Regions:
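Short, basic and Ser/Thr-rich N-terminal targeting/leader segments
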Residues: 41-44, 112-114
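Short catalytic-loop micro-motif centered on adjacent basic/acidic residues
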Residues: 15-16, 46, 162-166
Length: 188
């Protein structure tokens, strides 16, 4: 696949078939995605691949616990989960944003039907969070994980698969850690 074409054809895909995705395909995507750059080239990520029906349902339920209030904010014309605890007013395109989020709501309600979910963790000891002392929310730490995640999205496109990134599960990390028996020191 040509790079610029891949960059333009890797949207957030929120409608899926129930066609199975083979282990070989998952391995190929992850094996190539792991070459993503990371701070200090530490590559402290770990991926939990979820194909079990019960686990997918539990992950989807946890996702909806965060999605539902986020969507409610949008219906009220605000952007939820702002770093200062407020919901900032949407400045442009409120109706457009809400209409797009309605499609995302369909995904949130049916997430458990997706053939494969991947939960991406990072070993916190590998991160150099250079903006942690600034008077704003940190954005640097995720930089060592999102390169991998984007490579996964591109790999899925290369394999003819749809994909979508969501970060809402991070707020449910404790429950996810219990579900996946995640060791201490990792962030979702």
């Amino acid at each position: 696949m040509e790079l610029y074409n891949a960059m333009r054809t890797t949207p957030s895909c929120r409608y899926f078939t129930d066609d199975p995705v083979g282990d070989e395909t998952i391995h190929r995507v992850l094996d190539n995605a792991r070459f993503a750059s990371s701070g200090g080239n530490r590559q402290g990520w770990r991926i939990v691949v979820v194909t079990d029906t019960d686990q997918k349902r539990r992950v989807a339920d946890l996702h909806r616990k965060q999605w539902d209030p986020y969507f409610q904010h949008a219906l009220e014309g605000t952007v939820g989960f702002q770093g200062d605890g407020s919901g900032n007013k949407m400045e442009h395109g409120t109706n457009f944003a809400v209409n797009r989020l309605r499609r995302t709501d369909d995904f949130a309600q049916k997430m458990h039907e997706v053939p494969v979910l991947m939960c991406c963790y990072v070993d916190l000891s590998t991160l150099a969070v250079t903006d942690k002392d600034l008077n704003r929310q940190s954005i640097v730490g995720g930089g060592s994980l999102y390169t991998l995640v984007h490579n996964i999205l591109l790999g899925c496109t290369n394999e003819g698969l749809g994909s979508s990134l969501t970060t809402l599960l991070a707020a449910e990390q404790e429950s996810c850690d219990q579900l996946f028996h995640t060791p201490d020191g990792f962030a979702l």
